[in-house]
């Protein structure tokens, strides 16, 4: 299965039951709306009214609140037809339906953003090369390996590629980007996110349990049961690269 098929098998209506009306599909933390909190954390790195290219924009949750709260001009890129249609039909912001490996922006952006989407890239160096002439700031919220215990089956099920931090930094240094900010989140965000997913997955009817929804439930239970090992092996960090 390819990434586009993986994200096209479940409708936004089903996803709202699991991740809320803003359709933030990522890890969260804090009090109240934990998924929104995770996006708000990024505001400190993005000036108001910035132009933002949201790479792997999902159903537009991040771009929607950046536009609403910060007055940003957001353009999204997604490989998913379902996600692209949802963003366009709801007039959230301009969206490009494309594989990032085949996409080269035709304008300059203040920020390029990857929120838990960099891990889906098969050739991250190619994608970074494609966008590197269009921005001087790239922000990642991304998973990374902390040990050599690679959870291959879990990662493969999610069509992910997880690198060590030094590998990620090397992708950027080859294009003259320097790491200017790094913060770890997984040790305080994994547990509340898993509990949030599991609680909401109970609202999904059996007929609505697509392959993606089934995988999320299995994964959430796996993460809950193996939390200590996961946190030893995998991190989730905000990384800001600039030049």
Language-model regions, residue ranges each:
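A conserved beta-strand element that flanks and buttresses the S-adenosyl-L-methionine
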Residues: 113
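Short, glycine-/aromatic-enriched active-site segment of Class I SAM-dependent methyltransferases
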Residues: 143-160
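C-terminal helical/coil "lid" or tail adjacent to the Rossmann-like core of SAM-dependent
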Residues: 187-230
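A short glycine-rich, Lys/Arg-flanked "PGG" loop and its adjoining helix->strand segment in the class I
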Residues: 125-137
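N-terminal, positively charged/glycine-rich alpha-helical extensions of SAM-dependent methyltransferases
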Residues: 1-26
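Class I SAM-dependent methyltransferase SAM/SAH-binding core
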Residues: 59-93, 97
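Conserved alpha-helix/loop element of class I SAM-dependent methyltransferases that forms part
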Residues: 32-49
